[in-house]
Regions:
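Small-residue-enriched flexible segments
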Residues: 1-164, 168-177
């Protein structure tokens, strides 16, 4: 296994490329609207300071989720603004990259716009593994008649040994299901 480098890939002919995404996060709290933002700064959620929303949410969580919130907190941005009831998989997951305790502002790894629907998310090994397994099984079922000739797996830094406690977790599931 290599930990650095680059790969080049050229494809030609009559090919179909399908994309499968496993976010590996589960929603927590309520769906909210961004009421104030500036670039990647989240200034208001339903008229409240985002950090205050998080503090209230924290008080309602069990010990395990409270621990996860301290280092595995994400913001899910609803991808389709016309969805009435977005569910897991309908969100573009973005990192919470900073916070200002004085103003209650959160910095997010995405430019935000007022009116967007968002919900906080947590990532844990169990949810992440189940999500990957489910999307790969669905892909395999949907493509049963097509012979898959190749596949590429791109995994983010938040997964792998850091999340699961051992190497190759995602690769093993990928190999088994595809």
């Amino acid at each position: 296994m290599h930990n650095s480098g680059a790969i080049g890939l050229a494809l030609q002919g009559n090919i179909t490329v399908d994309t499968v995404v496993a976010q590996g996060c589960r929603p927590i709290g309520q769906l909210m609207h961004i009421t104030e933002s500036r670039q990647n700064l989240l200034l208001g959620l339903d008229g409240q300071a985002p950090l205050n929303v998080l503090k209230e949410l924290f008080q309602t969580m069990n010990d395990r989720d409270q621990a996860l919130m301290q280092n595995s907190l994400f913001l899910g941005v609803v991808m389709d603004e016309f969805l009435d009831a977005p569910k897991q998989g309908d969100f573009l997951i973005r990192n919470v990259v900073g916070m200002d305790a004085r103003t209650g502002t959160l910095a997010i790894g995405e430019e935000l716009k007022e009116g967007q629907m968002v919900q906080f998310h947590l990532r844990d090994a169990e949810t992440s593994s189940a999500d990957l397994t489910a999307v790969l099984e669905r892909f395999a079922t949907d493509n049963r008649e097509n012979q898959v000739q190749g596949a590429l797996l791109f995994s983010c830094l938040g997964r792998g040994q850091y999340l699961y406690g051992h190497a190759n977790h995602d690769t093993d599931i990928f190999h088994e299901k595809i």
